[in-house]
Amino acid sequence: LGVELPRFYVVAADLYPIAGIVSQEDFSVDELSNYLDQANSAVLRAAAKDFGNVVSVCRHADYQEVLAAFRDAGGLEPEAKRKLAARAWQYLAAYEATVAQYLSPAGTLLDDEVVMSLRKVSELEYGENRHQRAAFYALSGARPSGLNAARLHSGPWLNFNHYLDLDTAFELALEFEEPVCAVCKHDKPSAVCALPSQADCLRGALAADPAGAVGGTAAFNRQVEAEAAALLLETFVESVVAPGYSPEALKILRSREGLRVLSLPAPVLSPHELELRSISGGVLIEAKDNRLFHADPACVTRRKPTEAEAASLLLAWKTVKYAKTYAAVIAEGRTVLSVSASGSSSYDAVRAAVWHLRDRRPILPGAGPLVLAADAALPLKTLKAALAGGASAVIQPGGWQDDEDCVRLCDERGATMLFAGIRHFRH
């Protein structure tokens, strides 16, 4: 047309806050097209493409920096333009990934191509160690769930290791239908007790492993009442998590300085939740281990477990699922007495569990039969160590070449053994 249009030097554009919109409880997929901002997206994309000549700004937080650069120097340096362009591309990618995540059916994260958008929930003081940076992220656009939905009632902000302990402890507590207290430390169970009285659950867990409670996390699957709260004040537990707290319990717990008190009413897990682990050169993704058994465990010995043994075996099996492999758990009645984790072999794990038990009560016998759960199939030598340690009932995955010999040994010793038919490795 013979008209020379001026060039754009700065393009400032943002998009609908799609993550906040689709995460609303009453949002419907039919409304999504109203918030797909194609015009601004195209303009920002074009500006970011021509980053050598055009300054692309997608965050309000960058406005003052850009204005100051034009005011003081007449423009931005090439490096600053590239930085802003990269931020724009990241912004666009996160926007589109959020839409893709929202529209995708559950369980598609194992497709050939995976696009994921994460938003920062909180900056953490440090990672596993003080020299490591860390932050807590959640899926962009997802409705708050799990620890992202937790409410901190009292105490300092959480660090990286607190999140790990809280996740393990509360997941373990939610495995139980009856009242339970699970104490975890360093991302593994220390003690678990399931009794009708919540206060007795806490007493049992603390008595089983007093050292494990120091700096650990106590999780409950019921609203915490005043009696249990008063007992917690006498411990060195660092964090408490439960579905809720009575007003009196919350008042008591808030009186202890430094105690982190969290409520987490929503279930930690969704049926389709996945686990991601970074490795050199890539990321491993797997479905979460949400299954306790494939089917009812099979009793493979002549003697069947008594009612008390069966209850103890189930308690121990739920606990060993959350201990690091190789793991062994010894329980008595409704209390886990010893947890051995991260053994280099199942034999070492069982021997360590027996040693810990004897170290804590070297003389007096217990009130009931001891049971042992192992997360991996047991060779004959390992089973011998378990029975020699006092176990009268064992639950293990089965499927080892020594299975028949193990059954024969249990029958000779009058012990009972269940094959769970599923293993629970955890690394």
Feature-to-residue mapping (PLM):
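ATP-dependent carboxylate/acyl-activation modules
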Residues: 3-13, 17, 95-427
